[in-house]
Structures are given as C-alpha cells and as structure tokens.
C-alpha cells in the first residue's frame, strides 16, 4: 500500500475555470486540513482525487501519484482511499439495510464480511446494539448515526488514506464531538493519511498536522498547523484564523 499520495497541478473547468493548479501531498500518519470558504474548490479537489467529478466538470491538467508513480483515481477509490462524506444520507441506498451496505463494501474490497467483523466495526464507532443497527435502513437513523456508520465503513475498508469532507457539518455539538473523537481514534490506531476538508478552524486546531488554505480555486498558503495559526501570511488565512480566535475573545497578533 502507498505511503504517500500526491496531487500535482490539478486544474478543473466547467463553463469557466474552477480549480487552478492545485498541488497537495498526503502522507501516512498525518492529517492535512484543506480549508477555505464555500465555493473555494475544496470539495471539487476531493472529487477529482476520487474520480467522481460532477457532470459538466472536467479535469484539464494535472495528475495524481502514489509513491511517485502516476495512478488513476479509480484505482484509489475505496481500496486506497476511504471516504467520509459531507452528507452521509446521500451515500446510502435507502432500500438497503446497514448490514447490506457494510457487507457489500467489504466484499467489493475483498475484505472479511462476516457478522463478527461488521459488529466489531460498528461497536468501534460507538453505535450501541450493533445487531439492531445492522437491521436499520438509512431513513431510520439520525445524521450523527449515519456519519458514524460512514466512519465504520472506513474502518472496514482498512484503506491507507481517508478523505473526510466536512465530516461535522449539520451535526449538533455533541455529535460533532463524537465524530472528532472517532477520527482521532482512527489516526491513533490505524495511522492513515487523512485529507480533512473543513471550514471550521477549531477542527483544524484539534486534528490537523498540516494545513492548505484554498481561495477561488487556488492554494494560497500551506504549512504546518502551528505556523499557520501563529503567523498566517495570506489575507484569507489571517481572516480565518482571526475569526476563530474571536470566538475565544482573542486577537491575532499584528
């Protein structure tokens, strides 16, 4: 399995250019946060990595490399990169139970799909009464439960990399805390490389090792999390950090 995945000079376009020459490097055991406002190109960058661009959007330049060798996004999805999506409800077939979803995911990746394995993954993400959960349909579960189920699926995949696209969006504070605890646990136990897409600088401060700031389809600043919080250079980065500090009655040093 690869130890590093690199996005090199990715460019995306629809009727007009959307993403301009984005380069990112994911490394096993480290969390790279991709931050920026809505419409900055974060989710499109993730979609390009996985080969699931929306209709009408095409990649016009760039490549993806695994340990320095060019690779197709289709060869990464699921096997080498697990995904935790922004809207978990859209990721599940409403006609299938959680047992069917989990089992089919495992079988597609050549992983063990016995009930003991599925139960262990569900219990690992804090969903009580795994036997009952496996019988549930998506419409019978809350957003927080579905997000934890997506994390359980990522655990089952045992992929060396994870893309988590706004994993705490639209969740209440308690559910958000649980999801962040689970992501921390995965990093400690499995040490994948993680691309964490978020607009929440509190999430960045808690989980990230490195940060890339995106604005208008471009990476405007990259660095380790401590440097970025203590000495942001770009105006967009300074605005994000200042807004975060203001929540705690603090100001960014000039």
UniProtKB/Swiss-Prot annotation:
EC number: 7.2.2.11
Keywords: ATP-binding, Cell inner membrane, Cell membrane, Ion transport, Membrane, Nickel, Nickel transport, Nucleotide-binding, Translocase, Transport
One cellular component term from this protein's GO annotations in UniProt: plasma membrane
Catalytic reaction equation(s): Ni(2+)(out) + ATP + H2O = Ni(2+)(in) + ADP + phosphate + H(+)
Record's keyword annotation contains Nucleotidyltransferase: no
Keyword Cell inner membrane (UniProt): yes
Membrane topology: Peripheral membrane protein
Binding site for ATP: 36-43
Primary enzyme class: translocase
Location of this chain's protein in the cell: Cell inner membrane
Molecular function per GO: ABC-type nickel transporter activity; ATP binding; ATP hydrolysis activity; nickel cation binding
Ranges where the ABC transporter domain occurs: 2-241
Biological role stated in the UniProt entry: Part of the ABC transporter complex NikABCDE involved in nickel import. Responsible for energy coupling to the transport system.
Family affiliation: Belongs to the ABC transporter superfamily. Nickel importer (TC 3.A.1.5.3) family.
Record note on quaternary structure: The complex is composed of two ATP-binding proteins (NikD and NikE), two transmembrane proteins (NikB and NikC) and a solute-binding protein (NikA).
Protein name in UniProt: Nickel import ATP-binding protein NikD
Protein species of origin: Escherichia coli O6:K15:H31 (strain 536 / UPEC)
GN (gene name): nikD
């Amino acid at each position: 399995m690869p130890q590093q995945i690199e996005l090199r000079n990715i460019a995306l376009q629809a009727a007009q250019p959307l993403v301009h020459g984005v380069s990112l490097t994911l490394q096993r055991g480290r969390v790279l946060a991709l931050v920026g406002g809505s419409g900055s190109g974060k989710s499109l960058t993730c979609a390009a990595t996985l080969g699931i661009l929306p209709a009408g959007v095409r990649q016009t330049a760039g490549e993806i490399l695994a340990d320095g060798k060019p690779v197709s996004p289709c060869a990464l999805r699921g096997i080498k990169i697990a995904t935790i999506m922004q809207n978990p409800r859209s990721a599940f077939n409403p006609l299938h139970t959680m047992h069917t979803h989990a089992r089919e995911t495992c079988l597609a990746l050549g992983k063990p799909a016995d009930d003991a394995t599925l139960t262990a993954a569900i219990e690992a993400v804090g969903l009580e009464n795994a036997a009952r959960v496996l019988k549930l349909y998506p419409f019978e579960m809350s957003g927080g439960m579905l997000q934890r189920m997506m994390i359980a699926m990522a655990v089952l995949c045992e992929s060396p990399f994870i893309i988590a696209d706004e994993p705490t969006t639209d969740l209440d504070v308690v559910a958000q805390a649980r999801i962040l605890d689970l992501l921390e646990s995965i990093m400690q136990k499995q040490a994948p490389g993680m691309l964490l897409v978020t607009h929440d600088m509190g999430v960045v401060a808690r989980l990230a090792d490195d940060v890339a700031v995106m604005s208008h389809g471009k990476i405007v600043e990259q660095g380790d999390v401590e440097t970025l919080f203590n000495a942001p250079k770009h105006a967009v980065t300074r605005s994000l950090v200042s807004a975060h500090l203001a929540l705690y009655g603090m100001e960014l040093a000039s």
